[in-house]
Regions:
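N-terminal beta-strand motif that seeds the catalytic metal site of vicinal oxygen chelate
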Residues: 1-19, 77-82, 139-178, 220
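Short N-terminal helix-initiation segments at or just after the protein's N-terminus
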Residues: 16-30, 64-68, 81-83, 101-114, ...
């Protein structure tokens, strides 16, 4: 790998509460894509921006799905997904760096455009959870990006146009940052008094210990009534 990596999207695990999640994100002013049905059995909605997107991912109520990474995970943000222009090249690079990962897999979902059904196609390679304990990390290659980043879906009532910053809470920010650097050594890391900032090409990841997060985002915790904090 010869350059810093780009964030592709953030996956938000909804499990079987997709209708409720759609209602909440619509109230927040996002434009949601029509419901997608993956060939892997999962369902999704996307909120696409200029270069990245948020993805609500889950499974149908009462249905069965062979995706333990969704079924066994908590609700909420649990996927940090980077772009890949060639998933097999990414696979080779990860292998060279001796990073534990799963074999690439391919899947698709139908997309209707002017009553014509097409297929949005993807290839992914997932990294074992020893990189980030808080959730999944994987790479995604879009074989049909035009069926994801559609112009009519980029306009949001709340004027969002990209993911500016990601905040992560971690018991050991130094170790997590070190693990992420195994994926790509060109990521710039800046250590501050409060957190570690990792700069990707198109966004920034800030890793806080819980105590520092409370100090920096006290008003957010109060306003959102985050009792667990």
């Amino acid at each position: 790998m010869t350059k810093k990596i780009d964030l592709d999207h953030i996956a938000i695990n909804i499990k079987d509460k997709m209708d409720e999640a759609c209602e909440q994100f619509t109230k927040l002013g996002f434009t949601l894509s029509p419901r997608g049905f993956h060939s892997l059995g999962s369902i999704n909605h996307s909120m696409v921006f200029n270069n990245d997107y948020l993805e609500l991912i889950g499974f149908p109520k009462g249905g069965t799905i062979n995706r333990p990474e969704l079924v066994n995970a908590d609700n909420g943000i649990n996927g940090l997904v980077f772009k890949s222009s060639n998933i097999y090249k990414t696979f080779f690079n990860l292998k060279k760096e001796k990073i534990h990962f799963e074999k690439p897999r391919s899947f698709n979902r139908p997309v209707k455009i002017r009553n014509i059904e097409k297929k949005a196609e993807f290839r992914t390679v997932s990294i074992n959870q020893d990189i980030i304990k808080a959730g999944r990390v994987y790479f995604c290659e879009h074989l049909t990006p035009n069926l994801v980043w559609m112009t009519n879906l980029k306009k949001h009532e709340n004027t969002s146009y990209g993911i500016e910053k990601i905040i992560m809470i971690d018991d050991n920010p130094d170790l997590t940052a070190k693990n992420i650097l195994k994926i790509n050594k060109y990521i710039h890391v800046q250590k501050t008094e409060d957190c570690l900032n990792l700069q990707f090409n198109n966004t920034n990841l800030s890793i806080f210990k819980i105590e520092k997060f409370k100090l920096n985002y006290k008003s957010l915790i109060i306003n959102m009534n985050l009792k667990n904090f």
